[in-house]
């Protein structure tokens, strides 16, 4: 009694494949952790412990460090942007080298000041497509956010203020976009 047509068999295979993919994404989401980090904790240690898909929730305070992000994670501070990631005035304060990274509700400052070295508060490498930078203060950097080939990235609703001590021709842009198809810069306050 159970005779299936070629179309029904083909459809059944696709339905099973779709179910397996959906189940796999739900399992990955189910195992994503929220890691609470205080200003007294070592933020780089927390980043090293985080797994792909995890969220680092930063408490208010100052985190004197630079970050190299090499896995798809979210780093999120309080809505008032009182989690401050402060660089040491060399290089990039936050360098993102993984896809699907989100930075939200932070204050990022004190990158290096070399335009030729592409110093920036937040630097998105081409290996970091679909990055999302939102609701973040990016202050006192050479370049605020540098999208260096990170396709389909979004920089939205941020406040970006350049390093005022530099002469105008030594200052970088609030946001620089280079070779990043689909990148969007939307509703930012840049000065």
Model-derived regions, located:
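N-terminal secretory signal peptides that target proteins for export/translocation
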Residues: 1-13
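Bacterial N-terminal signal peptides
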Residues: 17-29
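Right-handed parallel beta-helix/beta-solenoid
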Residues: 27-45, 60, 78
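Extracellular beta-strand-rich solenoid/capping regions of secreted or surface-exposed proteins
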Residues: 44, 48-52, 63-76, 84-129, ...
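Right-handed parallel beta-helix
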Residues: 72, 78-82, 100-110, 129-140, ...
């Amino acid at each position: 009694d159970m005779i299936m047509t070629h179309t029904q068999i083909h459809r059944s295979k696709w339905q099973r494949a779709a179910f397996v993919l959906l189940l796999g994404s739900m399992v990955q989401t189910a195992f994503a952790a929220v890691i609470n980090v205080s200003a007294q904790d070592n933020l780089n240690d927390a980043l090293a412990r985080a797994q792909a898909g995890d969220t680092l929730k930063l408490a208010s305070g100052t985190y004197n460090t630079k970050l190299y992000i090499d896995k798809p994670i979210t780093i999120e501070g309080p809505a008032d942007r009182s989690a401050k990631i402060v660089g040491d005035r060399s290089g990039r304060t936050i360098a993102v080298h993984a896809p699907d990274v989100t930075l939200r509700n932070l204050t990022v400052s004190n990158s290096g000041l070399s335009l030729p070295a592409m110093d920036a508060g937040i630097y998105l490498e081409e290996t970091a497509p679909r990055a999302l930078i939102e609701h973040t203060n990016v202050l006192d950097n050479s370049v605020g956010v540098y999208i260096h080939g990170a396709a389909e990235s979004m920089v939205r609703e941020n406040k970006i203020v350049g390093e005022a001590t530099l002469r105008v021709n030594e200052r970088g842009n609030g946001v620089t976009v280079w070779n990043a198809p689909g990148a969007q810069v939307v509703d930012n306050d840049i000065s």
